């Protein structure tokens, strides 16, 4: 009995010392998210050449910053993990001190990607649109070189939509923050760039009710 109490105390102390991380969200996969052999290969799409050039330029900054941060040995200590994450983010901020929204998502890429996101959402059931937007209600717009909010969940991009977006290197990922599409540095938990209001506003529940009442 004393041993069990000790284990519970140690477990509680470990969890209390952990830095809160963005919680991953789980979505149901519907027919729109089933992988299709006809899915486009966006890596080869010439529309995104400028975007890929910007991504490669960012990865060079990320890699250079990473060499100035001590390597993390295999550890389960969350404080060491979060400490390196913060140190890496700080180094990247120094290198990108003058970064602005649109430096990676060029205007042409933002338009193309915005169209892809809008077309995908517009064919999804309204309840699914509301569910995605409700996951990360955000009142303050994102800012470049800031941390992805750890108090908010990491709203996942539907798999079917990911198949249509330009493929990213392993250190970057797409995330939603409200209606904004975020380009997130995974190892630094950093907002690299974003497309404002990439997700179209879902119809209000009152409008949906009105349509159902007057078909």
Feature map (PLM): residue ranges:
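Bacterial signal peptide processing site
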Residues: 18-21
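Post-signal peptide N-terminal segment of mature Sec-exported envelope proteins
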Residues: 25-46, 50
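Early exported N-terminus immediately downstream of N-terminal targeting peptides
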Residues: 45-109
């Amino acid at each position: 009995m004393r041993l069990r109490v000790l284990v519970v105390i140690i477990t509680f102390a470990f969890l209390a010392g952990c830095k809160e991380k963005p919680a991953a969200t789980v979505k149901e996969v519907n027919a729109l998210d089933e992988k299709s052999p006809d899915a486009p290969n966006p890596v080869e799409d010439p529309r995104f050449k400028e975007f890929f050039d910007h991504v490669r330029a960012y990865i060079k900054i990320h890699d250079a910053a990473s060499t100035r941060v001590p390597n993390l040995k295999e550890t389960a200590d969350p404080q060491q993990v979060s400490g390196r994450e913060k140190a890496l983010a700080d180094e990247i901020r120094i290198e990108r001190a003058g970064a602005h929204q649109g430096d990676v998502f060029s205007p042409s890429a933002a338009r193309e990607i915005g169209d892809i996101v809008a077309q995908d959402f517009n064919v999804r059931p309204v309840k699914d649109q509301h569910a995605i937007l409700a996951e990360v209600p955000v009142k303050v717009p994102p800012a470049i070189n800031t941390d992805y909010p750890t108090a908010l969940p990491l709203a996942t991009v539907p798999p079917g939509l990911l198949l249509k977006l330009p493929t990213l290197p392993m250190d970057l990922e797409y995330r939603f923050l409200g209606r904004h599409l975020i380009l997130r540095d995974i190892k630094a938990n950093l907002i690299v760039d974003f497309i404002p209001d990439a997700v179209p506003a879902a119809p209000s529940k009152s409008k949906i009710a009105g349509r159902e009442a007057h078909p």
